[in-house]
Amino acid sequence: MSGNGVHGVHGALQLLRSLPKVSLANLRPNPGSKKPERRRGRGRYRGRKCGRGHKGERQRGNRPRLGFEGGQTPFYLSIPKYGFNEGHSCRRKYHPLSLQKLQYLIDLGRVDPTQPIDLTQLTNARGVTVQPLKRDYGVQLVEEGADIFAAKINIEVQRASELAIAAIEKNGGVVTASFYDPRSLEILIRPVPFFLRGQPIPKRMLPPEDLVRYYTDASNRGYLADPSKVAEARLELAKKYGYTLPDITKDELFKMLSTRKDPRQIFFGLAPGWIVNMADKKILKPTDERLLKYYSS
C-alpha cells in the first residue's frame, strides 16, 4: 500500500512537470460558462434597419418627449396631484432624545442633574447633534425608557411627549418647552465661538404664528403658558397616569427646579445685551438707558 502511494505521488509530480505552466496566455473560461455573442445582422432585417425597425417615428431621428403617450391625455395630467411632500424642505426638524439616553448621560456624569439642563449641556455631553443650517430647531423628548428613568431634573427642550413629561414630573422634575430661532439656537449650541467674537448676546425671538398655540399651552409645558395653568396641568397629568405629584416647594433643590429663562433670554444666568469677555473672564453689562430699554422689551 505504501509503495503504491509513493509511486502515485511520483507519478503526479512527473505529470505536473510535463504540463505547461499556468499563465495569462493559457487561461480559458470553463466550458459552457459564456454564451456566444450574437453578431449584428442576424435578425429580421439582417442589419439593414440598424435595430430601429421599419418606418415610423421611432425609425427616424426624433423621439417623442418623456411622458408622451401617443396623443392621449398622459398619466401625470389625468391623475390629480396631492401634496404629500408639500413644503418638506421647509419643515422644522426636531431630533428625538429618549429618556433612556438622558438617564445614560446622567449616569456617566456627562449631564449634571443638579443644574438646569438645556441644549448647551446636551450638545456638550454629545447627547444630541443639532444643525440649524439644516432646518433643525432643537430636540424632542420622547418616552422611550420612561420605566427606568429615575433622575430629578429641570430640563428645557423644544418639544416633549405627554408620557415623557409624566415620567420626569413623577420623580419631582420639571419640563419646559421653549422655542429658539435659528440664530439663537446656533449661539446656544456653540457658545464659546460666539463669546470669542465679543458681541452682545442678542434677544431671543418669539415663536412664529403657527407655534404660538403650542408654546402657550400648559399641557405642553410651554414657556409662554400661564404658571397657574401649568400647575393645574401637572395635577391633571398625575391623576391621569395614577402617581402622586411631589411637592417641589419643599425640595432641597427647589431653587434649581424653579429656575426659568425669560422669553427673550438665551442662556441661564446671562441676560440679553451682556458681553462675555473670555480673555479677562469678565461680563460687561450695558448702562445706556436706550440699550436697557431695547434688550428688556
UniProtKB/Swiss-Prot annotation:
Q: Can you tell me which family this protein belongs to?
A: Belongs to the universal ribosomal protein uL15 family.
- Basic residues: which segments have biased composition? 36-53
PANTHER family cross-referenced by the UniProt entry: 50S RIBOSOMAL PROTEIN L15 (PTHR12934), LARGE RIBOSOMAL SUBUNIT PROTEIN UL15M (PTHR12934:SF11)
Its quaternary organisation is: Component of the mitochondrial ribosome large subunit (39S) which comprises a 16S rRNA and about 50 distinct proteins.
Q: Which Pfam families match?
A: Ribosomal_L27A
Protein name, entry field: Large ribosomal subunit protein uL15m
NCBIfam families, alphabetically?
rplO_bact (TIGR01071)
Per UniProt, subcellular location reads as: Mitochondrion
Transit peptide endpoints, chain numbering: 1-21
